[in-house]
Amino acid sequence: MSSLREIILDTETTGLDPKGGHRIVEIGAIEMVNKVLTGRHFHFYLNPERDMPFEAYRIHGISGEFLKDKPLFHTIADDFLEFIADSKLVIHNAPFDVKFLNHELSLLKRAEIKLLELEHAIDTLVMARSMFPGSKYSLDALCKRFKVDNSGRQLHGALKDAALLAEVYVELTGGRQSAFKMLDKAAKINNLSYNRLDSQAHRNIPVIKPTKEELQKHKEFLSRVLKQA
């Protein structure tokens, strides 16, 4: 049984539509293998080369002044594409983030770079609407439904929101216990012991059986992200 690598992703932007000149100002992506966070993540604030509208600032609290010395998207594009590799992207309201990411990639004007395909992304907003018709589907609402602690989320933040979405996604797909049962079964089938993920070998990931220590690190990683973001 092979391991399932997924990337939980979120972005913050200067506005609602890249066609209006809006850009990405923050990317947060977290690696999850068999529904367990590995601790590997990709996070950058980005200089959008434009002003920050007040409407956007009210949502995420990221100012134009703060972003002045941050890298441009083209300087981190290759690292971003290497991090997500061919893994499934898990996004809340995927069309929004994919639209902005593809706009940024298209600005690079590099033929070898393939744009992201929306149909290959897992949209947790669509999942929630299907599972709970008539309910509220915001990330905050889903955190409340699944008792995910989002008390530190006064403002939006890409890495912080990706960490919360990771917990919500696990619940949407059967819950933590379901994920652990899958890992135990995989470990028995393959007779493999736990191996730490190597940042240079994420394309060939070993099956992971989570230990008590790893589960504690999983919780500590989420706590650290929510406090720092």
Swiss-Prot record:
GO molecular function (one): DNA binding
SMART domains, sorted: EXOIII (SM00479)
Record CDD domains: DNA_pol_III_epsilon_Ecoli_like (cd06131)
This protein's record includes keyword GTP-binding: no
InterPro entries: DnaQ (IPR006054), DnaQ_proteo (IPR006309), Exonuclease_RNaseT/DNA_pol3 (IPR013520), RNaseH-like_sf (IPR012337), RNaseH_sf (IPR036397)
Binding site for substrate: 10, 12, 55, 60, 161
Pfam families named among the record's database cross-references: RNase_T
One BP annotation, GO: DNA replication proofreading
Cofactor, how bound (note): Binds 2 divalent metal cations. Magnesium or manganese.
Necessary cofactors: Mg(2+); Mn(2+)
Active-site feature positions: 156 (proton acceptor)
CC annotations in GO: cytosol
Keyword Metal-binding: yes
Catalytic activity field: DNA(n) + a 2'-deoxyribonucleoside 5'-triphosphate = DNA(n+1) + diphosphate
Known role: DNA polymerase III is a complex, multichain enzyme responsible for most of the replicative synthesis in bacteria. The epsilon subunit contain the editing function and is a proofreading 3'-5' exonuclease.
PANTHER family: DNA POLYMERASE III SUBUNIT EPSILON
Entry protein name: DNA polymerase III subunit epsilon
Origin organism lineage: Bacteria, Pseudomonadati, Pseudomonadota, Alphaproteobacteria, Rickettsiales
